[in-house]
Amino acid sequence: MRKNSSHENQSSENIIEFPYVDFEELNVHSNIFSELEHAKPSTQQQQQQQNISNETTSTGPRICISRDEFKAVNLLTKEEINVRVTPKKEEFSRGLDFISDLYDQTARKSGAVRVIPPDNWKCPLTINTTTFKFLTRKNNPSSMSLVSNYPLDAISSQQKFHGNDKTLEKNSAKATINKSNSTAETSSTATVEPYDSNDLYRIFDRPDAVVLSYIFVLGKAVDLLQIKQWLQLSKQKNLLEFEFWSQAAQHYKLDVNSLRNAYNLYAETGVTTRTGNDGGSPINRPAKRVKRQNHIPKCKLCAQEGSSLVTCCICQSNYHYACVEAPFAPFSDIHYWTCNSCIPSSLKILWKEVDYHCISSFLQSSNELASSLKKQLPSFLAQTPLTLPSNTKTPPASARQSSRRTRSTSGKGFETKISINLDSDIKLLNTLSPLETFFWCCSFPSTASTSSPFSYYPESLPTPLLGRAVNTTAFPTSRQNAYYNDPWNLYFIHFSKLSPLRFTPPGILTSTISLGQPLTCQGWQRDSMSLFGMHYHHYGAQRIWYVIPEVDGPKYEKLLNDLSPSFIQEKPETLIKSKILLPISMLISNGIQVLTFVQNSNEFVITSPNTYYTVLDTGFSLSESVPFATKEWIQDMHAENSFNMYKNLHISAPFSLDHILLANATLDKTVHSAYWLMTCLKDRVDRELTLRNEFRKRHPLLTWIPTPLESSVMACAFCKTFAYLASIEEKNGTKTACLSHKDECFPNTDSDLTVLVRYDDNALLAAYSKVVERAHKADTWLENYKEALGSDNSRPSLKVLKTLLNEAETICCPLQEVSLVRNLVKTAQQWLDKFAIIFKKKSMVKKEKRKPKRGSATHSHLESPSEEVEDLNSSNINEADLLINLVEEAEQFTFDFPEMAVAFEKAESLKIFREKANAMKERSLSYEECLAIVEEGESLQLKTPELLYFKQYMEKTEWIDSFNQISQKTDSTMEELVELIERGEKIGLTSDNENMATALLLKEKSENWMKQVEGLLSQETLSTSKLFQLKSEANSICINRGLLEQLNEVLQKSENFHTQLVSLISRARDPDYYSRPTIEEAKTVLAESENLTNKPEEYTVAQKLLTQTYEWVRRGKRLFGKANAPLEIFNQHLEFVEQRNTNAMVDEGSDAPFHVGNEYYVIAGSDPSDFHYCFCRQPEAGMMIECELCHEWYHAKCMKMSKKKLRADEKFICPICDYRVEVPRHSHRPPLIELQKMVDDIPTLPFQPIEIELLKRVVKQAEEFKNKMQSEVCDPTQLSEKDVPLLQFYLRKLEGSEILFTEELNVFRQKLHEFMPVAPQPPPFIGESRSNRKPRPTKRQREIMEQVESGKLTSAEGAAAIAATQTRNQNNFISKPFNVHTLSTTLSPWAMKSLAQAAISPNPMPSAHDLLPTSNPAELFTNISPEIKELSVDSTSTLGGLNSSHLVSDQNASVICLCRQPFAISDGTVQCHNCLEWFHYECVGLSSDIVSTLSNYACPDCCSKEGKLYPWNTRPRSTPSVWLSQAYSPSVLQGTTENVAFLNKAFSASANLFDVLPVSNTPSHFSKMDYVLEDRKPDLFTETYLSM
């Protein structure tokens, strides 16, 4: 398994669930033994075999055994026998009935038969490989042989050593065999030592052995095998020990220490409790639970009472769960549990000797074994010549045949005569395949004194494993699966209606799954109950079968008995259930037939009763087997012989034969079972009644008490068989005896005994009578059959035949006459189906009154029509000929029914009609004559050729009349024409016909017209002339009325709007502009036309003219900075401009410029409300601010200054005196020349906008004001200092106006600076005046604010999100080419206040030279203020752009991340815990999900310094065009109030630095610094939100 790379991944491994195995993708054919060629003799073997045959025999060369896919080979006679059966689908569906036929035909002689399912039969494999587990044992073939492990010489020596002592020491060592290396002759000598009889028992590999693997830990049963398997799996997954024990304890719901200590105790010391009941009876399951004891139960070990006790099903002893000897057998069924004392030592298997496996681990082990075997097989075949030694003389044939080996052992003194012929062995092995040769050579070395070329199983080769899972299946067990009710489903084969064992208790005869590996062989075996065996190969490589036929079974048993020691012969039950593997050469030498064949996947093998077989696996295989029974099991006395054998040997059988017979007699109601049951039951009832009569004579005083049928069944204490019919019990005891062994169990007295009778004498006779009665039902049915069909002249009705068939199906009568009746009914039903087709009637089959039996073949034939009838329904047939055929068939029927008379009468009428019709065909007919003959033919209700001819003649005549009517009408529709053409095609008219050709041409013209109309109506714009043309063409063709109505409707609407649009367009081109329509009128007409689905062509022209007018309006909006506003805003803003210009350009008198502030109205003595102030030229209102230089009063509202932000001693300089103070504006001020161009373009507009007159007034007013200024200031160069009030006066008016007077404004500002300088530099030339109001929040910013208010986002997250949106907007703005106008950018009102204080402060201002940038950008802060100085070095991360390597090439400056870029608000950052440096997520290969799981982070540099490997891939970002003034340290991104204040503080510092930069002559490297210090701080909305 794959190793995990980290501890986190290891903890996620689950040892409870096994790896998944996909059998569909698993390539079994890649194994070396899955190919067919390895099951064939090799070329080298054939040559060696031929050479050996030439040397050893004179009969000629011997041919190798062929691995024919279809036949089996008899290894004794070399005869080929066909054991392969490929049934059809019908035969395969019969199930057990088909198997019974196979047994009589093939299997009885050969012992086994291969059944190949039909091609479409493929049962799915339903094993869950993630949970399926099974027991495995090492399957070394040498350990299963009496010959290889324990040679006869050694056994004889052991018997001589022990003498007559039956009790053998358990701790004695095994006999050892020393072999000499002599090439001439090998003699085996045995060192005689005491041996362990338990180890000798193990070679028999009993299938009923029990694995002792369970222990109790804190009152809970724990499987040691399961823990051992999980421990091996955890080692493969590199799982830590504490993690393994934690998962195991969680599964068992125990603490870790208790579970681990308990496992280690048994794993290290191997503690077990063995009892000495070596000769005890084997485990047998009673048919039902034993009776409850009357006395209070007590534990056998602690002698204490208790409620939680478990009872042994054999000795009836009670145990506490905590007192049970450990390890013990599993509690799979609490009623069939066996204690350790009752399990014979030969059947006990400790948990260390076996293993649990899963499919994946077993498959891996199989592949390893196959790989090792692939390497050793060629060398074995090359180095082991299968020939006799060169110095060994071949004895003559007579001597070889008479060669015998006789061994005598003391003790029992038995003699064994076994044929061991080395020559025969070599010949046999040369005829086998390479794999078989390797198996039989290495697994069974010869024990003869002659030299042997064979050796034991190679130690370097892994021992194959054998897996078994009892009481489980790989067949579907879900009702939703199609194979659930399949008769070949092994899991449910016992419940088949033909199975005699379907009434046995559940859980007795269950299926077993076997998993094999290369060289796996289970030993010779047969069913101990002489049952049939069904073996299905689910998946995997081929399996080689070796079968001993039933006739040679006694020979094999005698040979096995002769090979067994005396103490084994004394226990024949051990041999009955054993699996001993004897070499096939030994069997053939003793005259025992052995058949061999190959089984592939998806094939069945059926074994007969008393047949011995073994299977050699050639690779990984998964198969399933189950014992079952057919009627032959009881008829052929297999069942009775098996139960008699169990009874004679005193072995407990798994169930009772009496129960099987009586259950089939009383519960089964079919005649089928009565036939084979009648004879068997008669013999059993006679024997039972005879035994009861004799018993009553010997014990007349015993009381006979009836017992219920469902009561418990007890076994006889002497013969161990179930006393089902009658039993003898003590009143106060637990011993039970049958009627035959009363004296053996109760020899003394009869006083306390009672006979319990389940079936009394009358009940037995009644059961037999019912069986006989069911069997005689067939005779009764035969009498009725003979009465109905017995005589030759009798013609029974169909009703009588159906009654006979229903009776036969009810009683399941297996008679040949039933098939005859079924065929007659089927033939009659087919005739009736044809009759119903002719006369257009429903099937005359009547429904049965009762529900038919499931799977009944008769009812399926009656209820479903035949294939012939279906063909008649699906095709046009000649019913006249069919009626004649029916009449001919009915004349041959031997039965009668009413429909036959109707058919005869109809046939006579048909004959008369045909004669008359044929006579009329020879002359011309009128329409009336043709109509009469057609009506006469239709009255017969039959399809005849004559009737069809006259119908076509009439239809052609009618078609011509219809065509003439359509061609003459003007309103014919397309549907009528299509219907007419279809009628003509049906009656056989082609395009060669003149009328048909005309109809097709008319259809083509109509379709073209419809396509033109549909295409025109689908367009958005229509041509009215084209519509009128199409309408006129509709009168001469066949049209679609719905399409014509739609055309008329569109034409009517388009005609009305066409007139309006033509008039609108012609007026828009009128030379007189004021005669042109207004824009509102054009909008109204186009809005009405918008509702049209198809618009006229003039609509597009009018829409373009309207768009041209809208473009003029949009141009005006853009001039005032309202590009995104609706069109109506242009008119509204012009009204605002007109009002502002009127106030600003008002004539205030010739002396107004020379009066300032309070002095003016104090001196004049006038009302202050009559005078104007500020640049808005409005009277005094609200709070007013006085300029410290010109002493003009300004509205605080106009300057956007609040009373809260002003101090009493604060100084103010107006924008007129200091050009650097900006005037707050809500919109752009377009130059006058642009507005004049718009007025000049008015005559070119197609429609009249409503803004025309308003725009003209605004422009006219501005021109008049300009002329007035130029008249007063004729020559600007002649202005002097005394004209400063005049310049200030007009500058206020120019700033208050909403129109930009470019020349006047620039000239007056230059002159004013010349006469009264305030700023260190003259004002720059301005060519535009834009709005400086704060932007409104975007849609995204409003959504973020709503999320913060609703609580979905915190204030810090909201601030970061808003800053990120501004960063994107600014990046988009930077991507456009522009010039950074640092020195011409006006300042905000918040920066204007500090500059006003500095202007009127007595301290001199710093010069421009002092503010030039130095090598370290942080030094720029030292010349500003102490407050800003704090932000120089310690807060360089706040102004991240100042220490960026993109700006200053300072080697000592700290590096930011790996990408050398600053941090933005939207970036994710992480800090190293060693160097405390910050990094971007993506630069160091991290993400937010990864960072959330880290407790400590080390950067790549720190990892390299410590000698560690950095676990992530670094991906430094490229250098984009970033907005450096938005780079902040990661601490600012946390969103706290202190960080937000610190951020605002840094923005203020950068803005102040920008204000004091020099004008010109800056170094080249200063452009970057100037770019950083530009006033690009967040807008006022974001600043306000961050302050929140």
UniProtKB/Swiss-Prot annotation:
Residues 475-645 form the JmjC domain. A zinc finger (PHD-type) spans 298-345, 1171-1220, 1454-1505. One of its GO terms (molecular function) is zinc ion binding. One of its GO terms (cellular component) is nucleus. InterPro entries: JmjC_dom, JmjN, Lys_sp_deMease-like_dom, Zinc_finger_PHD-type_CS, Znf_C5HC2, Znf_FYVE_PHD, Znf_PHD, Znf_PHD-finger. GO terms for biological process: chromatin remodeling; heterochromatin organization; mating type switching; regulation of gene expression; transcription initiation-coupled chromatin remodeling. Residues 51-60, 385-395 have a biased composition (Polar residues). Keywords: Metal-binding, Nucleus, Repeat, Zinc, Zinc-finger. It is found in: Nucleus. It comes from the Eukaryota. PROSITE patterns: JMJC, JMJN, ZF_PHD_1, ZF_PHD_2. Residues 82-124 form the JmjN domain. Residues 38-60, 385-412, 848-872, 1319-1341 are annotated as: Disordered. Has a role in regulating chromatin structure via global deacetylation of histone H3. This function is associated with the activity of a histone deacetylase. This is Multicopy suppressor of chk1 protein 1. It comes from Schizosaccharomyces pombe (strain 972 / ATCC 24843) (Fission yeast). The gene is msc1.
